[in-house]
Each structure stands twice: as C-alpha cells, then as structure tokens.
Amino acid sequence: MLLDLNVESPERSGTSSSSVLNSGDAGGGGGGGGGGGLFRFDLLASSPDDDECSGEQHQLPAASGIVTRQLLPPPPPAAPSPAPAWQPPRRAAEDAALAQRPVVAKKTRRGPRSRSSQYRGVTFYRRTGRWESHIWDCGKQVYLGGFDTAHAAARAYDRAAIKFRGLEADINFNLSDYEDDLKQMRNWTKEEFVHILRRQSTGFARGSSKFRGVTLHKCGRWEARMGQLLGKKYIYLGLFDTEVEAARAYDRAAIRFNGREAVTNFEPASYNVDALPDAGNEAIVDGDLDLDLRISQPNARDSKSDVATTGLQLTCDSPESSNITVHQPMGSSPQWTVHHQSTPLPPQHQRLYPSHCLGFLPNLQERPMDRRPELGPMPFPTQAWQMQAPSHLPLLHAAASSGFSAGAGAGVAAATRRQPPFPADHPFYFPPTA
C-alpha cells in the first residue's frame, strides 16, 4: 500500500486529518468492485451519515499531477543598495532640471564679467550706492563716471568701447543703438570723449562733482585745483560756493597754463582767452615770493629797492676780519652822521645788524660818567668791551609773513634808543662816498 499525503479527498477537501489508503492490489478487498479500492479513515470528524456508509467503497479518480504548496512565508523584497558616502544623494527633480536647462552660447569676451553687474564694464559700489563705469586702455583703467542705474553705466561703457576699439568691440547692447553717437565721436579725441561721458554722468561716485578738477571740501564749499603742473602734486585754486564756479575757475586755469587745447568742463569759446594773464609771468612771480618764517636781511644786490650803501669799517681784534657794510634806506632818517671830511662822530640813534665779525660786540651796560677813566685812542677794542655785550641783540627787521605788528617793532626800537651810544673814544673809519 502507498500513503500519499499530497492528494486529498474530494468530499473532505477542507479536512487535514483524512488519510487515504491506496491498495495496489486490484483484486483484493471486499465489495467486488473493479478497479483500485480506496478506504478512508476519518478519525477526527465523523458524522452519522458517514458512519452508516463507512464501509462503503468509493472510487476516486487518479491524481493527474503533483501539487507543491509553500509552507513558509515568502522572503521580503531586497532593499536597494545605499549610495557610497563620498557621493552626495541627487534628487530626481534636480536631475530633471539639469536635463531641461538650455545650453546658452557664450559670447567671446576679452575679460571676465563684472562681479556685481550683468553688464560689462559696470561695477556697483555699496559705499556710495552708485554704478560706476570703467574701461581698460593700454593697461590703465579709465574712469567714465558714476550713474544711478546699471543700464546708463553700461551705455557709457559701450560708447567708450566703440571709440577706443572700433566697431568690433564687445559691447553690452546692439551696435545699431549708437548710430548717432558714431557720427559725433569721429571729431573728438579719446580724452575729450571721456570727459564728455563724465559730464553726462550724474556725478562722480568717489568724489562729489561731475566736473573736472572740482571736489567737495570738508567745510561744505567746492574746491578747485589742478594736478601735476610745474612739478607740483596739485595747485590749489580756491573755494567756491557752487561747483559751477569752481569748474569755471579750473577751466580758466587750464586755458592759462595749457593754452587753447586744454581739456575744460565747458566750451573754451565761452572764455576770453586773450584777457587771461600769461602763465609764464605768474610762474616767475611765484618763484620769487618767499614766505618762509624767518628774519629778512637787507639785500645789497636788490635792484628794485632804493637803498644807499654807506661804508662802515670797524677794526676788530682778528687780523682776518673783513669790512662790514650797513645798508640804510634813503627815505629813513640818517642814523650815522657822515661828513664829507670823513670825521668820526658818535651816533645819535643806533641800529644794529648781525655781523660775522666777532669783535663787533658793543658794551650796553650803564656806567657813571665820572668814574670812567680818560683813555686815549685805542687801536683795538678792549677785552671788557667785547665780553660784556649781551648774548642776543634786538633785531628790528621781521619777516613779511611772520604776523608781528608794527607796535612790537616800535617798542623794541624805543628800548634800543634808551641805551647809551657807543664810546666816543672808539675809532671809526668812514671811507669817502663816491
């Protein structure tokens, strides 16, 4: 007999406790039925109907095939392998955006784009809140002006690029937008065209004026000055209430020093060039002007001053002493009385000048007249007369730019007059005047 657990009875398909006994002997068993006899033993689920016909013989069809049942649950689906740690995860939306992004053809440029503007040659300055336009020419950056909008600054750059580099220049807009400018810029030089662009701007972003040579001073007024002229860093022209006045002052100075070809803020024809003074004469006058804070000494070689030279020869204790010449103006009162016979006379009002002769040190100390010994003529001054002089002498000449008033000089002169004159016994030699 063969016991097959994979085949279940058609009547008890839902019961799992049925057993099928298959007899391999075709002629064995009771009942006299032909074919294979099948005996079913239902031990767990029994009913009265089943008990009555428990001895009945049933005929079951032969199994046509083997059925395999899954006893264990199926395994879960395998998870996708994680991305490596060095590769960041990419989203599907980003991949789709990259795939749909159109490829823009880049225009050939000579330099990088501006970091703060989409236009070439335009830069935004946060400190001033203005848009500045620049262009490179011969390795130098040329300033074109400050503007309120980036569009205006870009147009200024385009005009300068066409002027500097021709029709093949890289510009921000179409070349057809500048047809009118092409006709006008042919008659101008590069420097003149740059100044025209600056005048059309809304003001200098780094300075405070759109005019050349004009800046806003700290005091609130407009300062005009010229730079790099006559070897100086700049020349100060003055302060003005309005920037137009300062610009016109700069124009007049530029025409005065550079001629009719000077670059000005306004048209040179609006100025009377013939009435302007010559720059060469002013340069000479400025060169002779001495504003140093020092004591002025009389100049014997000055042909402009009307002075008379009076010779005063003093005998000093040094054998190498030289003659001393004192200059006396013609208009002032004579301080040394000189006769035609050249006789020595005591001075009435002394006026001292610094001298290189060490022996010319007068004794200004008061002495009683009765105690002074009677001395004859001495060829050389005594040692006491040399050493008893004060270390500093009052000087009546002051510098023109020192700022001292005339009253102070008069006080010093009065104090000098109260001092006694030179000793009468000191010999003076007055050479005859021509």
Swiss-Prot record:
Transmembrane segments: none
Ranges of compositional bias, category Gly residues: 25-38
Region (Disordered): 1-116
Family: Belongs to the AP2/ERF transcription factor family. AP2 subfamily.
Motif position, EAR: 291-295
Cellular compartment(s): Nucleus
Biased composition (Low complexity): 12-23
Protein name: APETALA2-like protein 2
Biased composition (Pro residues): 72-87
Entries under Pfam families matching the protein: AP2
Organism this protein belongs to: Oryza sativa subsp. japonica
GO CC annotation, single: nucleus
Swiss-Prot/TrEMBL induction comment: Target of miR172 microRNA mediated cleavage, particularly during floral organ development.
Subunit note: May form homodimer. Interacts with TPR2/ASP1.
Annotated tissue distribution: Highly expressed in developing panicles and in young seedlings. Present at low levels at all developmental stages.
